[in-house]
Structure formats: structure tokens, C-alpha cells
């Protein structure tokens, strides 16, 4: 970048690594089935509980990417379908446009008997992991990396890392 002034304020830097209040994520059979169908999965383990149990799962397993699905709960969510109200802080920046820079989910479960399945109740919390500035072909950009940690009975079962690009 040139000698442009940084849009990353001290307040923004202080927010890096600060974990939000936890919120509850209930994994439900209907949600698993709908997500699997929408994505195009055809494996019966995502639709039929008997098939899932034959493969060693406790119930219908979460398909890859399921945890990244936004869930609107009127009691806890932003009415504009954003993050939970107690999720990550939002900051004012001069940028008016945004892009999803991608999502990666790392699972810490060990095999089918330990997989995240329908019926699980997870606790999730999020934090800003990093803020960086770069110059792209359209000008300066603010890149925000966030992490959402999913716990089952206090044990981390997955971490979702997402990248947002403001420009």
C-alpha cells in the first residue's frame, strides 16, 4: 500500500481475539436433511436415520459445510439475518462494498461415532482473528478473518474460519 492512512483503529485492534458470548446451535434432523438436499448430497446417511446408524453414526450426521449455514432465531438473531446479536463487533469503515472471501471448517471429531449429528446441542462463540489491509485492483481493502468455535459438552468439535473483504 502507499502511505494511505490505515482504517484499522486502536478499537479494532483491541477487538482481535476477544471471544463473544456463547450461543446455542441445535442440530436438527430437518435442518440436516434440507441442507444435504440443497447441496446435492445423495448419501442416505444424511436422510435416513437407520442408514446413518448402520454406518456407525448416532443419528443423521452434519454434512460438510452445515455449520456455516446461517440460522435465523428471532430471539437471538439480528432481524436483518446477520450474526447473532451477541456475536462479533461491527466497525464503521469507509468501505461500502463487501465480499465473502471464503469459509473453512476444521473438524475435531474422531470417526462416525463422534461426529456432529442431529440431536447435538452445540455452544458457539466467535471472535475476530485478524484484520489486515491490502491494495487490490479496485483500491484498498480491509480483510477480516473470523473464527467461530463450536463446542459439545465443553469440548471443541469444530472451528469455522471465515474471511470477509470490505472495499
Each PLM stretch: what is its role?
Residues 2-102:
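Hot-dog-fold acyl-thioester-processing enzymes
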Residues 1-13, 103-167:
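HotDog/MaoC-like acyl-thioester-processing domains
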